[in-house]
Regions:
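Membrane-proximal intracellular helices of multi-pass ion channels
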Residues: 1-231
Length: 231
């Protein structure tokens, strides 16, 4: 979870360094071709990024834990506090660590969708969330990489959903869309969670799309892996 945002960014946020040394640390840890300051001081920039990261963590734990309590669950397993914490750490850091051999297949649809949405969010450049917080929506709309990233997810989800729907017998279209959206966000962000037992059960076209997304990766400045959309 600490490594998701970057251990060097963590060091930058909480250890005293000169501004000249800080920029080298931030560039070394940055996952994209460019690195910029959100505010004038790099230490404050790192702290803002970590506060957003921590906020996502707290929100996802709450959604997972209280969601199953409030809305009920249609899965075999229920998201207790321990499960919520483990899966949240695996989601926001895009590390994908789980506690069941079947992945997330036997958790509720609600829990799967919460995790999918947070995987998608954590694949976006964290600078974008800061711009949203300070009300600079025009700059957010100009973020070309984010729109390409969302476009890849939408097109891939629709393509895989219909491909699977017409290739697998007795499969509801809603389930096809749910599983395809989850797997697309999981693969493009390099998280690796799964809601299906075996990808080999899917058609070759769907497997190929996921294979390509694995290399493309998420946005620069996110916690996701891959080559990055900006490149």
């Amino acid at each position: 979870w600490i490594g998701g945002m970057g251990i060097l960014v963590f060091v930058l946020a909480f250890l005293p360094k000169s501004e000249g040394q800080n920029i080298h640390i931030l560039r070394a840890e940055s996952t994209g071709p460019q690195v910029g300051k959100l505010v004038s001081k790099l230490k404050l920039t790192a702290r803002i990024l970590y506060l957003i990261y921590i906020a996502f963590t707290i929100l996802e734990v709450c959604f997972l834990y209280f969601g199953d309590q409030v809305f009920g669950h249609d899965g075999i397993y229920k998201m207790d506090l321990f499960s919520s914490l483990v899966h949240t750490f695996g989601t926001v850091g895009t590390g994908g660590f789980g506690i069941k051999s079947t992945g997330l297949a036997e958790y509720s649809t609600y829990s799967q969708m919460v995790i999918a949405i947070f995987m998608l969010l954590c694949g976006i450049n964290f600078n974008v969330f800061y711009l949203i917080l300070i009300g600079k929506f025009k700059q957010v709309l100009k973020c070309e990489e984010m729109w390409w990233y969302l476009g890849f997810i939408i097109v891939s989800t629709v393509s895989i959903a219909f491909n699977v729907y017409y290739s697998v017998d007795n499969l509801a279209l809603g389930i096809a869309f749910k599983d395809s959206f989850f797997q697309v966000t999981s693969i493009i962000t390099s998280t690796g969670f799964a809601t299906i037992p075996h990808f080999s059960d899917w058609p070759a076209l769907s497997q190929t799309i996921l294979w390509v997304l694995m290399f493309v990766g998420a946005c620069a400045g996110s916690t996701g892996g891959g080559i990055k959309v900006s490149r």
